[in-house]
Amino acid sequence: MMTIREYKRAETLEEAWQLNQKKANRVLGGMIWLKMENINVGTAIDLSGLGLDTIEETEGSFSIGAMVTLRQLEEHAGLAAYTHGAVKEALRHIVGVQLRNLATVGGSIYSRFGFSDVLTLFMAMDCSVELYKGGIISLQEYAERPYDRDILVRLIVKKEEAEFFYQSVRNSQTDIPVLTCAAARLENGSYRIVIGARPLKAVLFELPAKAGVSAQELAQNFADEVKQKIVTGSNMRGNAEYRCHLAGVLTKRAVLELEARTAQEEN
C-alpha cells in the first residue's frame, strides 16, 4: 500500500522540480502503477494545474503535455491521421477505457517499462522529450538513461514524410503484450523498426533503403536482420526463443504492409 504524508498541487514547474529533489517525494501521474507500490511518500506532487494536459498541433509538429491521458491520445484526430491509425492501434489494447482515462503520457514515458506500448509507438517517430532542467533530448536517448529527478514536461513529435504501422501479440485482448512492434517507412525507403516487451525495454533498429528488390524479399531481409540482432528474454508470457521468432514475424508483416500502402499511394 502507498501512504502519502503530504499533498502539494504545484503552481510552477520550478516548484514541482524543487519538491521532487527530495528522495521521499513523488510526482503523480495517473496513479496507475504508483499506487500499487508499497512505499511511504513524503510529498505527492500534482502537476495537474500546470496546463500540461493538452495536445497542440502545428504545421510541423505535435506537442503532447505530460498530463495528457492515453485516452486523449487515442481520440486525437490529428495523430490518427498522421500515423494512419497506429496511435489508436497501440493504445486500444491497454486494459480498458477507464484506465486509459487515468494513465498519462508522462507517466508512461517516464516509467520506461519494458512492456510499454506507448514507448514502443513513439520511438518509431521523430520524437523528443522536454525535461524541465535537462532540455530537449531524443526519446531514444531518454529511454536509455537511468531514472532521475527531473520533470518530464512534454513530448515533441516532429512531422515527417513517413508511414506508420503498429502491432502487438497478446495472450488475451487486454493483457500486457508478449511482444510489440512499431514500424515507420520514411520517404527515402528506409525503415525504423521498434521492438518492445522483449520483455526488456523497447529497442530501435534503423534499416537502410534497398533498391531493386521486391517487397517480399525486402521484408524477409529486414526480418532476418532484426532476428539476428535482437536480444530477448523469458517470463511467464513467453520465452526468449518465441519472442525472437515473433520479432521476425512482426517485422516482416510491418514491412509488407507499409510497402503495399506506399505502392497503392503511388498508383
Could you say what each language-model-derived stretch is?
Residues 1-267:
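C-terminal structural segment of proteins
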